[in-house]
Amino acid sequence: MSSNLGKEKDCKEKDPKVPSSKEREKESKASGGFGKESKEKEPKTKGKDAKDGKKDSSSTQPGVAFSVDNTIKRPNPATGTRKKSSNAEVIKELNKCREENSMRLDLAKRSIHMLPSAVKELTQLTELYLYSNKLQSLPAEVGCLVNLVTLALSENSLTSLPDSLDNLKKLRMLDLRHNKLREIPSVVYRLTSLATLYLRFNRITTVEKDIKTLSKLTMLSIRENKIKQLPAEIGELCNLITLDVAHNQLEHLPEEIGSCTQITNLDLQHNELLDLPETIGNLSSLSRLGLRYNRLSAIPKSLAKCSELDELNLENNNISTLPEGLLSSLVKLTSLTLARNCFQSYPVGGPSQFSTIYSLNMEHNRINKIPFGIFSRAKVLSKLNMKDNQLTSLPLDFGTWTSMVELNLATNQLTKIPEDVSGLVSLEVLILSNNLLKKLPHGIGNLRKLRELDLEENKLESLPNEIAYLKDLQKLVLTNNQLTTLPRGIGHLTNLTHLGLGENLLTHLPEEIGKILFFFFFNVSFLFV
């Protein structure tokens, strides 16, 4: 390679602003995917997690938390110095790649403003990584890399691509996430060998009819753009396995989506969807369907034909009922989220509809009763969230929920907990905050696996002595009650790491509590009388 590479002129444009990790993955928790907030399963490129949620981002796993960058950052040198140093490194890498005839070139995170045109000499390359740079354009010479299979361009400031890229007949993966594209570059539609296309977090408003030319696509991610509709031609992508259109402005889906029968993951969360086509029932391979945060008022009956569905998230829509028998037909469903809708009662369908459910989230609805026997066949139900409903009592068979591990009944109108709570022997987390409880049953002492017990904002006047049997308890929240004394046995809870006693009527503590003062952070304030 010519030594003229060292004389490449430095670009003097300002460094573009790169969105923070919080901005890129703001949603969710939940959240996931779909309830853990959308987890976009993108492959990792060297040194970078190519993922969402978390989804989401979240990507965020519906569901489904995200990591924090704790990297120590050294002071930046003067801008001019950085550019010269960056170019020198690039030249060194290009020369090394040519001399070693390497098929892989990683130029990520080099603060590159302009890729040297001499890159065209590296025709042996099959992988080129340019993510996390400061590129505003690509030189046409990249089109000379006719053996490229992978081209990673995420986290730059690209607004277009050169037409010469249509020479890349072998390209299978193109990553354009986190750029400044206002449209899908026309050359992308001519890359007919593509199997994976990432366009997440751009400014794209339209998907053209030419998308049909990318018939080999198995993964298409166009989440976090400004797309208002998908063309009917999307139905010609018959090899699609994952379609991620979350965080856009879709109001409807084309009926032709039903032709994409290989899809297993369909993420439509955070759009403006008003309805779903009946043809969605043709997606016989569908295992994950994310519809949280839309404007749906009904679910088509045809969804019952999606018998492979494992996860269904309908959080934050306007749904008040489900088609009768829908859940019973989804024989592989393990995770169901119906939170933040308009349900006034449990879905019609009887006990069989929950026989495979592991996690059920009905939070923030208007449900006033859990029907007797509704979980009689729910042998694997481990997580139930009924927070923020209108429950005044619990069903008589409450004590038969023996597989329950996490139970959230917060923010209801419960006045008592049945004595047969003692039957919930697998319970590890019990949330009863914001209710009207005046006392706890003695059977609470049988929950030997309990790690967290939250009783904040009730009307408790005392605690049963049996609470001393909860030896695994790590968190006990009793804040905002009417307690005047504590049982002496509380001193036996040596695994506690958090004890909340604030806003009660306590005038003294039992001597035994001194045994645990050295083992945990003591969060307490007194209201003396």
Curated annotation (Swiss-Prot):
GO CC annotations on file: cytoplasm; nucleus; protein phosphatase type 1 complex
- Write down the species: Gallus gallus
Please report the residue spans annotated as repeat (LRR). 99-122, 123-145, 146-168, 169-191, 193-214, 215-237, 239-260, 262-283, 284-306, 307-329, 331-353, 354-377, 379-400, 401-424, 425-447, 448-471, 473-493, 494-516
Provide the family line. Belongs to the SHOC2 family.
Q: Which GO terms describe its biological process?
A: cyclic-GMP-AMP transmembrane import across plasma membrane; intracellular signal transduction; positive regulation of Ras protein signal transduction
Q: Where in the cell is it found?
A: Cytoplasm; Nucleus
InterPro entries for this protein? Leu-rich_rpt (IPR001611), Leu-rich_rpt_typical-subtyp (IPR003591), LRR_dom_sf (IPR032675), LRR_domain-containing (IPR050216), LRR_R13L4/SHOC2-like (IPR055414)
Q: What is this protein called?
A: Leucine-rich repeat protein SHOC-2
Name the job this protein performs. Answer: Core component of the SHOC2-MRAS-PP1c (SMP) holophosphatase complex that regulates activation of the MAPK pathway. Acts as a scaffolding protein in the SMP complex. The SMP complex specifically dephosphorylates the inhibitory phosphorylation Raf kinases, stimulating their kinase activities. The SMP complex enhances the dephosphorylation activity and substrate specificity of PP1c.
